[in-house]
């Protein structure tokens, strides 16, 4: 029997791009999407430096074990907050990492003046959908459309 004990140390906003962050996205993004490559160092730098995005990372036993991107932007009807690209390393799943990332994002959106936080999640991501519902997210009666360029 293998016992995995994890200690979530903290969730933080990435302030700079270093080898650790680049390497973390190199192993995390393939666990989220097989159709999109991990962001390059330059793309990560653009994300971290953008006033419209917060790159959150969760550390477990000192190692980056999860990430979430919080996109915030103002439109005529108010400040919008969107949670995007939530990914937790397979070895750390089921230990509260995703919950910690989402709670941090919700609180940060609230602190910055948003009144709602939106996200999308594929139906096949059953564990993630249960987490979102447990945290208080509710399905909206809306359609999501995509135009591919």
Q: Each predicted region: which residue ranges?
A:
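Conserved N-terminal entry element of GNAT/NAT acetyltransferase domains
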Residues: 1-19
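A short helix-loop-beta-strand connector motif used in the catalytic cores of GNAT acetyltransferases and
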Residues: 46-57, 77, 82
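Conserved beta-strand in the GNAT
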Residues: 57, 63-72, 82, 87
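Conserved acetyl-CoA pyrophosphate-binding loop and the N-cap/start of the following alpha-helix
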Residues: 58, 92, 96-104
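A conserved beta-turn-beta hairpin within the catalytic core of GNAT-like acetyltransferases
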Residues: 73-83, 93, 140
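Active-site acidic-Proline motif in GNAT/NAT acetyltransferases
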Residues: 89-91, 95, 123-124
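Conserved active-site alpha-helix within GNAT-family acetyltransferase domains
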Residues: 99, 103, 111, 123-141, ...
């Amino acid at each position: 029997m293998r016992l995995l004990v994890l200690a979530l140390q903290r969730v933080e906003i990435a302030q700079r791009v270093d080898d650790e962050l680049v390497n973390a996205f190199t192993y995390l993004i393939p666990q989220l999407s097989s159709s999109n490559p991990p962001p390059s160092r330059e793309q990560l730098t653009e994300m971290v430096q953008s006033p419209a995005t917060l790159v959150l990372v969760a550390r477990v036993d000192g190692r980056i074990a999860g990430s979430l991107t919080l996109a915030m932007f103002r439109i005529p009807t108010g400040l919008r907050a969107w949670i995007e690209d939530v990914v937790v390393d397979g070895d750390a799943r089921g230990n509260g990492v995703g919950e910690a990332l989402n709670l941090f994002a919700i609180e940060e959106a609230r602190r910055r003046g948003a009144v709602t936080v939106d996200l999308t999640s594929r139906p096949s991501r059953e564990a993630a959908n249960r987490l979102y519902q447990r945290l208080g997210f509710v399905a909206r009666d809306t359609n999501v459309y995509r135009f591919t360029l």
